[in-house]
Amino acid sequence: MRADREELDLPPPVGGVAVDVVKVEVPATGRTLVLAFVKTCAVLAAVHGLYILHEVDLTTAHKEAEWEFEPLAWRVWLVVFYFGCLSLTVWLLEGSYGGSDHHAARAQSPDVRARRSELDDNIAQMGAVHGLELPRRQVLRHRGT
């Protein structure tokens, strides 16, 4: 049973037991890892598609003497696919979906330097209030004994 039941917006259920509702958030590192994985898979799929289309283009060029069909149709699709892959690669390497997600994730990262300076300030204040406690050896050396 919660001691601070008064802070809840909803009254506790029958039986007097309150339930905490917690908003589950995915950490920024997890989101970044999944996004990098998806981008890598997209680039690999694009490269694989380029390889297959290149092989088809080479195969049609070798069989061109035997068959009478129009290789221009394959070349148009190949150019369209090249353009699509290049656009996808530039978009993925740019790393932003409008710029908001990438910059928001960077803004939420903890500032370690500020936390360290805050810790140093707290230590300095504790030393000023309580006095510095030196180990016994240092005190004896300082006295000269």
Swiss-Prot record:
Secretion signal, residue range per the UniProt entry: none
GO cellular component: host cell perinuclear region of cytoplasm
Main location: host cell
Subcellular location: Host cytoplasm, Host perinuclear region
Lineage: superkingdom: Viruses
Disulfide feature: none
Inducers of expression: Expressed in the intermediate phase of the viral replicative cycle.
Keyword set includes Plastid: no
Key words, A-Z: Host cytoplasm
Record Pfam families: Adeno_52K (PF03052)
Note: Expressed from the major late promoter (MLP) and produced by alternative splicing. Only protein expressed from the MLP during the intermediate phase. In the late phase, this region is spliced to allow expression of all late proteins. Very stable protein with a low turnover rate.
This protein's name: I-leader protein
Organism: Human adenovirus C serotype 2
